[in-house]
Structures are given as structure tokens and as C-alpha cells.
């Protein structure tokens, strides 16, 4: 594949380095760079010590990147050192930008107006405390802030884009930062790529690996496509990047996957199972009955805006008594088959369907562990039922690997795919 412009990302913040705060900026920036056709060379995370930040900048430059993007360390406190370090690294003096200071002051006034606990008389001291955020490397370009921390672009080889840490402040200014002349100059050598995402469920990674090896041998020009695979929530996400002149190679690859793996390939346009289920539920009303997942499926269904149009309600029936009282499950059924059984899952779904007056119901009952398993029903045994008011039903028992959290999360994925298949009229296991 052709060599493109390359970038490196430096995430700063001791709270991110130590895991107290999850890095959401690195993956987001990486996706935006890839969309632009910019190759991502490295993502690094470092603490707030100036020497560590400068070491990361130097490392990126040594790797030959054209653009460095930093996030974090732009606040007014003593440990916010990114701008000072970038200025020193770029050999530029720190100067006060009067216009920027006034813009920050206006933002502070608005924030103070929303907080009656702050005395107006204290504004001058607050402005002085935030003056640090108006100190910029000489010759840099300011990106207007959403909060009080502006973005900065420092020209050079490599160019340095300095962005705030909070995603709600970083993401809105990205498009302006990327359009600045220094950044456009830095990424001028980028290559135009297409990126396609295929999602697969119910296929072992080893089977996909076998198919890709066969594709490499059978499809001319296979080396023109770049494939990455990721196992997430029990699904395989396969992302393929290629230049437009390799489109035919990708078409042959997608056809091979479709021919070999049939319904296991459930999305060729990147749509998630959550998106597909939401579309299939249009005009319907669903109710859920959950035991071991304790509402995680309902949470996943309602995570999408507009879900109130198709989600009727949910019941978490953890104990046997709750299954009987809330869902009408016959205690004799539980006594005969156990709470984790297909008959009980079917009864739970029927109870949810009737109790909420829904036309679609999904039930989950299982053993998430770490205790509670038996030789006949080990930890990871989970029973599912999807029931529609026209009589269509799908019931499955699976054994899921992993710890308690893994089993619960994967259970919601299995349930979503059973729901997708049942609503789509697709036969067979998920």
C-alpha cells in the first residue's frame, strides 16, 4: 500500500495513565485521522510531568510523523503543563494572547452567571487564575474554545495540534483544527482510502483466519488491502482499508466471506446488531425478562435515542419467588427443571409478553458465577427465549466463557442476535 502522511497521538494526564480515567480521546482521534487517510503511527499515554510529555513529543518526531496531536493539560492549574512543554519543544516563546484572554473572560462570566455561589467581586482573581490558558507559543494558531481551554496548532515539522482533555471540549473543535493551514500542510501527503466494516457473530476467530489465508492465496492483489480484526462482545469486527483502485479485491473478499459463512456475517455496512434490532423493532413493542443479566439487556435496548417507541418495559426477576410473582412462572416448573432451563426461559418470556401487553419478548436466565454451577449446568450456562405474539419462538441454551462480567455481557449479545434472527425469520443458531 502507498505510504501516506503519518501522525502520532500523545494523551497526557496522570489520571489517564493510572487508569482512574478511561482514555476516550485516543480512539476517537485515531478514527478521525484514518477517515482523512492519515496513517496512525503511535498512540502514547504519559503523566503530567513535563519531562515525560517532552519525551513523547521527541519520540514521535524521531518516528518521522508529520503531525503530532496532544490532548489534555490545558487547564489553569499547576499540573496543566502541555502548552509550556510544546512551546519549549518547538523552540517558541510563550506569549500572552490578549484577544484569547478576553474570550476566556467572557466564557468565565457566563459560567459565573449560572453559579450564584460565586461572588461577582471575585471575578478579577478568577480571570487572573485563568490567564495561564491565554499563554500560547508564539506564532501558533488559536482554535476557539468550547470551555475555557483553547486548541492550538503550532507550525513545524512535525506540526503539533494541542487539544483539550475533556471529550466534550475536544470533539467540537476538531474540524476547525484540522482545517488550519499548518495541519493541512502536514497531512498533504495523505492517501485517499476506503474503509469497510464487516461484522460477524457465531464464527470462531480461527475459522475467519482460515478463510483469510485462503483469500490471500486465491484473490490476486490481496496485499493491496489492509485487514484488522477485533473480537468484541463475542462478535468479530473486521475492518478493511484500501485505496480505490483495490475495490475489486475487497469485493471478491466480501463475496468469499458471504459464501463461506452465510448468516454468520450479519452486517456488511458496519451497522451494529443494536442498530439492526432497533430497525426491526419499528412498529413493535418489546418487553424483557432477565435473571442473571439483571437488566443489562433492557439497558442495551434503551441506550439508543427513540427507544421509548418500541420498548414497553422490563422485569428483573432474580429469585425464584420473583419469577413466580412478577412473571407468573409456575413454581412447579422451576422445581422440575431448575431456574436455569429452557422451560423457565419460555415461561419468563410468556409472562413478560402478557404482563406488558407487548408483541415481542426476550428472556434470559443463567449462571454467571463464580459459584452456583453444577456438573450438569456449569457456570456460563445461559438459557434464552425470544417469543413473538404470532407464535414464533426461538429458545437456546449456550455455555459462555469468561468471568461473571464477561458472561453477563456476552449474554446480552446472544440475546440481541436471537432477537435479530427471530424478527428477520432467519433459522438456525445465533
UniProtKB/Swiss-Prot annotation:
InterPro entries reported in the protein's UniProt record: CinA, CinA-like_C, CinA_C, Competence-induced_CinA, MoaB/Mog-like_dom_sf, MoaB/Mog_dom
> What is a single cellular component term in the Gene Ontology annotation?
plasma membrane
What is any Pfam family matched here?
A: MoCF_biosynth
Tell me its family.
Belongs to the CinA family.
Q: What is this protein called?
A: CinA-like protein
User: What organism is this sequence from?
Assistant: Mycobacterium tuberculosis (strain ATCC 25618 / H37Rv)
